[in-house]
A protein has these predicted regions:
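Conserved catalytic core of the tyrosine transesterase superfamily
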Residues: 1-222
């Protein structure tokens, strides 16, 4: 990219582009970072359920940890997106791909607790709003990440990598896989456009990997 820039500015010849070696870049080469199941529960339990902001944060954490919502999904969630009668939550994610996810009693009760006893009076139709005036929708996905990061530090958990809100999404997928869920099930819940995106989680299923690991001479299996 830098050499192309130099060539466009006539600082070097175009023929020099062919002298720059191509660096291999493998798709899905990295490992997804996730929290252990007990750490996810500690994270959720760190919220002060008697305080308004604690009710809000707990409901958000449960949506991230139980349904795999993205930070942007939380920001754009509106009151009319929740079908209380039938127990569904409507989410419009990446590329405006809409999905209907089951609303469990645990998550539903947490949201109700916030709406009835924690959410300030406001004309905004956003489910989750700022805890201080002006009471409007959260500004961006960054606000959700800050919220999760604060909960991680409050729970005394060492974060395994970069990112905060997405960490709970990875944790859910990894937990589902370890408990026997198929990649197709995980792909459906996480609303991946292709199951190929979900396949990266197969790398963290150590139990399954042990079953297919080939023995190496003079080296015992894991």
């Amino acid at each position: 990219m830098f050499v192309r820039f130099l060539a466009s500015k006539d600082f070097c010849g175009v023929d020099l582009l062919g002298a720059v070696p191509t660096v291999a870049c493998w798709r899905l080469a990295s490992l997804p970072r996730y929290l252990a199941e007990e750490d996810v529960e500690r994270l959720i339990d760190s919220c002060n359920r008697s305080a308004a902001i604690g009710k809000r944060d707990r409901a958000i954490l449960l949506l991230l940890a139980r349904l795999g919502l993205r930070a942007g999904d939380i920001v754009h969630l509106r009151l009319h997106d929740i079908d209380w009668q039938n127990g569904w939550i409507h989410v419009s994610g990446k590329n405006r791909r809409e999905a209907r996810l089951p609303l469990s009693k645990e998550v539903g009760r947490a949201i109700v607790s916030y709406l009835q006893n924690g959410r300030p009076k406001t004309t905004s139709d956003a489910v989750f709003v700022r805890s201080r005036a002006p009471f409007r929708a959260l500004a961006s996905h960054c606000a959700v990440s800050v919220l999760v990061d604060s909960a991680i530090r409050r729970a005394g958990i060492i974060r395994p990598g970069r990112g905060a809100a997405h960490l709970l999404r990875h944790s859910l997928a990894s937990s589902m896989l370890r408990h026997g869920a198929s990649l197709q099930d995980i792909s459906t819940l996480l609303r991946h456009g292709s199951i190929e995106t979900t396949q990266i989680y197969a790398k963290v299923d150590v139990t399954a990997l042990k079953q297919i690991a080939q023995p190496w001479p003079e080296v015992p299996l894991c």
